[in-house]
Amino acid sequence: MNSPLPDITATDEWSALKDNAKSIESTTLRDLFANDQDRAKNLSFSVADLHVDLSKNLINDDTLTALIALAKKADLEDHREAMFSGRHINSTEDRAVLHTALRLPAEESLHVDEQNVAADVHDVLARMRDFAHALRSGEWLGVTGHTIKTVVNIGIGGSDLGPAMTTQALRSFATAGISGRFVSNVDPADFTSKVADLDPAETLFVVASKTFTTQETLANAHAARRWFLDSLHLEDGTDEANDAIAKHFVAVSTNAEKVSEFGIDTNNMFGFWDWVGGRYSVDSAIGLSLMAVVGPQNFMSFLEGFHAVDEHFRNTPLEKNVPVLMGLLGVWYDDFLGAQSHAVLPYSQDLARFPAYLQQLTMESNGKSVRIDGTPVTAPTGEIYWGEPGTNGQHAFFQLLHQGTQLVPADFIGFATPNDDLPTADGTGSMHDLLMSNFFAQTKVLAFGKTADEITAEGVDPSIVPHKVMPGNRPTTTILAPALTPSVLGQLIALYEHIVFTEGTIWSINSFDQWGVELGKKQAGELLPAVTGEKGVDTGDASTDSLISWYRENRK
């Protein structure tokens, strides 16, 4: 029997951070900046096109030194190399973790389990490019001879969130007249609302399911099949219907038998691999709908952005390694300063779905309570990720960030040049500049606040002064980029992927399985006969029995 893992919380490095936390709690960001004129310069970093300012975080030099020491104690560098080299670090499923291989340049090779996975990746990319070119050029025609104008991606989880988020984020790069829509929820309203105004003759469905057995995805895929055939007055099972299905449905899957049974030509099936987790798969064939909308060249630029951050993460010393530092800050706030959530605030409407995407990436990865050896964790793990685009969030939940009792570290993401801009009301200014003035103001006020003396000096009624005090000392990280391009989007996603890896390594958890998700799916299948009335209500607990009985009595 293997000996249990060392307990990171019992180390001198952990103790040093506990001591440092006491020191940090007795200081302020105002003091930290006043005592170090070079703080902003020393705590600003570059990774590819991203400018990352960590200076408004609740840290001092001793904090960073202790966090780096903790990373080394946890063998972060060795674990990082194990991932990049293809070792089976997903221990519960005995799999390599190689999303980084999805964006390797064509001239590189990576042999894992006696297979050149880089060559396999580029074989699939070549087929994806051919498919996207055919759609975008009008070479691919539907059953009535019309070109395809809408690609509807049917998937769930990583097979939906990634393509949906990135297609919205890169809408400015959709130039071929093809739009993307995304269906994920098994709630029928999701499918019916997404296809209500579509012409089936000009619609193509991408069914994304690795096993082609995912309950929600297959339910929506069959709904799409019925809608498509009924709309074109085709009888299912006829040669004419089968020909139509083959021209309007493609699959992202590895189960050729199931794909063929559905009626999809397996020549139009795009595969991926067990070493790609769903939440890390947007740059695999799961991104087929994105490539169709923005084009192969932009998709390859997207991959190049990922790879640039991969190289930074793999090769940069820990002290200047941006995803490492941001991951260590996550551990710092979670385990030493008592934060339980993390806000992501993109000042870009195009990134409206980015916080939701990060919810799956971070919470499905690091929402674990046992370590890789099966023993309980000894410190809090994971953070609740949430957020909305600015300035919407300012008028919704920023009040809590500024004056509430919760410590909520926040990442602000902004861009120097917008993909869209309009003049201000007087016609002399830029709405993007107005947006970014709010961006900079929020990080400033969160950090430095406003004291009672400063408010009193403005002549405010003394009884109101306490209500207007802004305590400040609310930590933020600022991420700026020249513009939201395919490459920059890839860089942002890779940045957070490696933040997740860093945190998971410190906590000694497996960031690449999701057994909590699996059990829920299994239970749903077992309960379905009781829900539909095919069998009696006897689920094993009185609450669930009562709820299903109420549902059946009120179901119309």
Curated annotation (Swiss-Prot):
Keywords attached to this entry:
Cytoplasm, Gluconeogenesis, Glycolysis, Isomerase
GO cellular component terms, A-Z: cytosol
Where does the signal sequence lie? none
Presence of the UniProt keyword Isomerase in the record: yes
Q: Which GO terms describe its biological process?
A: gluconeogenesis; glucose 6-phosphate metabolic process; glycolytic process
Stated EC number for the protein is: 5.3.1.9
GO MF entry, a single one:
carbohydrate derivative binding
Catalytic residues, per the record, are: E364 (proton donor), H395, K521
Its annotated compartments are: Cytoplasm
Tagged with keyword Isomerase: yes
* Enzyme category, top tier: isomerase
In what pathway does it function? Answer: Carbohydrate biosynthesis; gluconeogenesis; Carbohydrate degradation; glycolysis; D-glyceraldehyde 3-phosphate and glycerone phosphate from D-glucose: step 2/4
| SUPFAM superfamilies found in the cross-reference section | SIS domain
Which domain of life does the UniProt lineage start with?
A: Bacteria
Catalyzed reaction equations: alpha-D-glucose 6-phosphate = beta-D-fructose 6-phosphate
Q: Which InterPro entries match?
A: G6P_Isomerase, G6P_Isomerase_C, Phosphoglucose_isomerase_CS, SIS_dom_sf, SIS_PGI_1, SIS_PGI_2
Question: Gene3D superfamilies given for it?
Answer: 1.10.1390.10, Glucose-6-phosphate isomerase like protein, domain 1 (3.40.50.10490)
Function, as annotated, reads:
Catalyzes the reversible isomerization of glucose-6-phosphate to fructose-6-phosphate.
- Spell out the family assignment given in the record's similarity comment: Belongs to the GPI family.
Q: What is this protein called?
A: Glucose-6-phosphate isomerase
What is the species of this protein? Answer: Corynebacterium kroppenstedtii (strain DSM 44385 / JCM 11950 / CIP 105744 / CCUG 35717)
Q: Which gene encodes it?
A: pgi
